[in-house]
Amino acid sequence: MSRLIPLELPPAGGHPHHVLLRLPDGKPEQGPLPLLCLLDGQWTLPLLEESGHPALKRCAILSLGYQGERDQITRYRALDYTPPGPDGGLWEDPRVPQWQAGGAPAMIEQVRMALALAQGMEPALAHSRISLYGHSYAGLFVLYALSQQSLPIHHYLCASPSLWWRDPLIWTLLEQLGKPVQVDILAGASEAWYPLSAQAAGPEGRKNGMPTLPTMQKLQAQLQAQGMQANLHVLPGAGHGHVLAQATLRALELASSAA
């Protein structure tokens, strides 16, 4: 059993965030519960709930997600999870110019407020080891948060991060990192990058994909060179669409067992 507590944040970027704090019943066996901060909670939290994974009994979860139609959520994600332009402001998404992008600094503040609300609701969480997890665009946001290191995050988990987004922007941001932290990269063995978005490709689908695993290995090497405890977890047989479920469960395992 568990407790699911709704938390209210002021809207950011012109849209609200649906925030839930999930607490397992009972007291932790040893020390404070680890806290896993889930992005895209509209998809990731149900995946964990339905899994019945035993790690749910030893980990608190802070879920930040969206409500609405999928097309609407896609636009929200493009705004919230992407780095700002050279002037620090908003700009357009490179693959879908109709999408506004560059709202990651505002999303950083949303995560900060959500963590403060969660710790106010459950004071013991003030002593928790906090992990931040995101997939795809949300994985890009996790790396942006790592580059800023302005959140009280101890452990960063990025699944299939959108490293291609305005390449080499995120690589540049990751060149000057601060204190060493744990970073876990999760990637599907069969993933590929396509120059067209799924929406732009239309019913015929996308072709001529470029394998992304070598890029994930490059990311691991760059982070390790800066003293990060960077690990790469390859999910066998998984393409981009299948990574979300596998990676989210793996993220729970890593967050709940991280020292």
Predicted regions and their residues:
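The feature captures the conserved acid-bearing segment of alpha/beta-hydrolase catalytic domains
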Residues: 158-240, 255
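Short beta-strand immediately N-terminal to the catalytic nucleophile in serine-hydrolase-like folds
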Residues: 132-134, 159
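A domain-start/cap signature at the N-terminus of enzymes
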Residues: 1-34
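Gly/Ala-rich beta-loop-alpha elbow adjacent to hydrolase catalytic centers
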Residues: 134-138, 142
